[in-house]
């Protein structure tokens, strides 16, 4: 005998979402929750977390409050299997899956001291500055990820930004505005509810650098974003003044 119990889960991530719990075999049919990118044929044995993280933040991420509501509904259930609409059936490590969904849906970082440096460079000078900062931080023993927004699929960049507790944005100025890859990245972060992070800024612009001001304006529209005081402002290639600014930014990034 199989008995199904239906649990509404609106906006995870569609308005009409409903999950089902099969009481005999303890199976949760979770709809879009606990899904993962990747075809079963090619990624069946791949670790669940990286692609589940990317799926969560890019598909469900905006609806953290609704995910929290679903987690409360299923908290009293004994679950032996999770069957999502996307990705593999889950039969192992379910406690960790639930723990991560609780963390992700509260917009908390998995690694609070890790830093993502996301850069959008036109001719390479901004990218060089980003890589220089990475080297300085790694000498301090900091875990650093770096992402070139001009070539990286934004879904990976977004997932990495949420994974880390700190973010450094490095962008060239373009026609008096933000270089489009950085502008699009910030729009994606805002759409997915990016919050609770510490952020540093690097800008570049030969005549009138404006990227830092524009990035700050966009970040101030997000919740609980702490901006570091030091801004590295380049006018082309990295120089001694910028090196001093960068050392000050490194000190701030490592102080908390």
Q: Where on the chain are the PLM-derived regions?
A:
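Catalytic core of the metallo-beta-lactamase
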Residues: 1-45
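Short gly/ser/thr-rich secondary-structure transition/capping motifs
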Residues: 9-10, 99, 147-152
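Conserved hydrophobic helix-helix packing surfaces used for dimerization/oligomerization
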Residues: 4, 27, 115-117, 199
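Short hydrophobic segments within beta-strands
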Residues: 30, 85, 118-120, 202
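FMN-binding flavodoxin-like domain, especially the glycine-rich phosphate-binding loop
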Residues: 40-82, 86-89, 132-147, 157-256
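Short, charged N-terminal beta->alpha structural module
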Residues: 118-140
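Glycine-rich beta-alpha junction loops
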Residues: 33-35, 86-89, 122
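Short N-terminal or domain-adjacent regulatory/targeting segments
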Residues: 83-111
């Amino acid at each position: 005998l199989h008995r199904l119990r239906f649990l509404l889960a609106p906006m995870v991530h569609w308005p009409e979402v409903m999950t089902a719990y099969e009481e005999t075999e303890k199976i949760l049919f979770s709809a879009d929750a606990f899904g993962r990118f990747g075809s079963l044929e090619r990624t069946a044995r791949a670790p669940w977390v990286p692609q589940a993280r990317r799926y969560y933040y890019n598909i469900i991420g905006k609806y953290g409050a609704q995910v929290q509501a679903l987690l409360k509904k299923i908290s009293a259930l004994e679950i032996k299997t999770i069957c999502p609409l996307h990705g593999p059936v889950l039969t192992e490590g379910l406690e960790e899956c639930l723990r991560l969904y609780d963390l992700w849906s509260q917009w908390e970082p998995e690694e609070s001291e890790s830093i993502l440096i996301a850069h959008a460079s036109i001719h390479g000078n901004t990218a060089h500055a980003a890589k220089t900062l990475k080297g300085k931080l790694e000498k301090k023993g900091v875990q650093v990820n770096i992402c070139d927004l001009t070539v990286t699929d934004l879904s990976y960049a977004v997932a990495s930004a949420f994974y880390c507790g700190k973010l450094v944005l490095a962008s060239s100025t373009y026609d008096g505005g933000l270089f489009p890859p950085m502008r699009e990245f910030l729009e994606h972060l805002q759409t997915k509810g990016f919050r609770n992070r510490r952020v540093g800024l690097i800008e570049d612009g030969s005549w009138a650098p404006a990227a830092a001001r524009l990035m700050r304006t966009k970040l101030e529209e997000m919740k609980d974003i702490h901006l570091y005081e030091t801004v590295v402002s380049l006018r082309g290639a990295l120089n001694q003044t910028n090196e001093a600014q960068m050392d000050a930014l490194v000190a701030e990034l490592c102080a908390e």
